[in-house]
Amino acid sequence: MNKIISNKIINNNIIFRNNFNNLFFIRNFINNKNNNNNNNNNNNNNNNNNNRNKKLKYSPNHQWIKISENKDFATIGITNYVSDIVNNEFNKILKIKLPKINDKIRLNQPFLSIWTKEEENIQFKSPLSGIVSKVNNKFNNQQTTTISTKTTTTTTKIKPKLPLKSNSLFFNNDQDSWTIELKINEPFQTNHLMTEEEYAHYCENTDYK
């Protein structure tokens, strides 16, 4: 993981900027690349594309979004790209805080806060508006473990970590990687969200094919 990414955290509310911050440029680049590939290779399909989750969208602040088929719920999680950075490049995560069930969340409202020793508060902004219907409590605060012997009882704090399932940029939609579920109660647009291919270029992942 590129260590200079951590230096791109700007202020305390803007997270993980990178050089590919112009989504219009990325989409034009991908369209041109795909057109060239189609012209040169009409009969060759990339098998990897068949295995990718076309239903997931990605936000500029490194969250994945899965919208239900009837479009009334959205599950939101953190991608491996940013999870790996936070886990490996910050010495200590002090606290992780999520909203409560029934909280109203607006588009671009900070809803997930991570306090670290180096950065006072890293915040993730919501990619959609809605009402919190579920919360993944595995993200909330520190946990403790207690070990008892015949003579002593020791309570140890477990260092909080963001879930990381693979070396991929992307999270699978599993029980550990999601943060909240939103009940969507108003019309919404997804033009500001990225496909997997767009997100890979946004993260400057040259290995994506």
From Swiss-Prot:
Chain residue ranges for the region called Disordered: 35-56
Composition bias, Low complexity: 35-51
Domain Lipoyl-binding: 73-159
GO BP, sorted A to Z: glycine decarboxylation via glycine cleavage system
Cellular component per GO, a single term: mitochondrion
SUPFAM superfamilies in alphabetical order: Single hybrid motif
InterPro entries according to UniProt: Biotin_lipoyl, GCV_H, GCV_H/Fam206, Single_hybrid_motif
The protein, known as: Glycine cleavage system H-like protein gcvH4
The organism of origin for this protein: Dictyostelium discoideum
